[in-house]
Amino acid sequence: MQKVVLATGNPGKVRELASLLADFGLDIVAQTELGVDSAEETGLTFIENAILKARHAAQITGLPAIADDSGLAVDALGGAPGIYSARYAGAEASDQQNLDKLLLTVKDVPDEQRRASFHCVLVYLRHAEDPTPIVCHGSWQGVLTHQSSGSGGFGYDPIFFVPELGKTAAELTREEKNAQSHRGQALRLLLDALRNA
């Protein structure tokens, strides 16, 4: 079984990706379990930040690495919070603080203009100097609610309403979310790419 470092310290992402990767034959180890600190996210896009994180983890551990960079893009805010989703309310902000700031920012935005999309970029590096990383992108369309609903998921899930399902992302079962989400989409693309590599 191939050991691969997961270049994230976000426990929500670790849980979600570990459950999605469970059947693929990869021994996924979170970078925090290997004593790897988070890489500085200096990129201007999800792709740049995911590559930075994967390269950092691969350099330190000597293992192949998978990194995720993801976030929420709100149409009415020109794509914000975007790459700053995890630190929208400040560098040390909690998920709840980020969510509260976003709700306050869009409180006067009318319902028909509350479109948003989650984006996830997954990068796989075979080694730290890999010149051809595998890069996969998934996106998930929804609408921002006016208040939180649901207790599942993490981050902005309680205010991300999925019209086709009639629920917020936080109200979905793990199976429903994995089948629909930006991260589930990106991971299926990554697994297909790894099978064909």
Curated annotation (Swiss-Prot):
Query: One GO biological process from the UniProt record?
Result: nucleotide metabolic process
- Which reaction(s) does its UniProt entry say it catalyses? XTP + H2O = XMP + diphosphate + H(+); dITP + H2O = dIMP + diphosphate + H(+); ITP + H2O = IMP + diphosphate + H(+)
**Sorted alphabetically, which keywords does the UniProt record give?**
Hydrolase, Magnesium, Metal-binding, Nucleotide metabolism, Nucleotide-binding
Q: Does the keyword Phosphoprotein apply?
A: no
Which cofactors does the annotated protein need, by name?
Mg(2+)
What Gene3D superfamilies does the database record attribute to this sequence? 3.90.950.10
Lyase in keyword set: no
Output the superkingdom of the source species.
Answer: Bacteria
- Binding site residues for substrate: T8, G9, N10, P11, G12, K13, S70, F154, G155, Y156, D157, K177, H182, R183
Enzyme class (EC, first level): hydrolase
Q: Which residues participate directly in catalysis?
A: D69
A GO CC term assigned to this protein in UniProt:
cytosol
What Enzyme Commission number does this protein have?
3.6.1.66
Which purpose does this protein serve, as stated in its record? Pyrophosphatase that catalyzes the hydrolysis of nucleoside triphosphates to their monophosphate derivatives, with a high preference for the non-canonical purine nucleotides XTP (xanthosine triphosphate), dITP (deoxyinosine triphosphate) and ITP. Seems to function as a house-cleaning enzyme that removes non-canonical purine nucleotides from the nucleotide pool, thus preventing their incorporation into DNA/RNA and avoiding chromosomal lesions.
According to UniProt, the name of this protein is dITP/XTP pyrophosphatase
Which classification does the entry list for the species?
Answer: Bacteria, Pseudomonadati, Pseudomonadota, Gammaproteobacteria, Enterobacterales
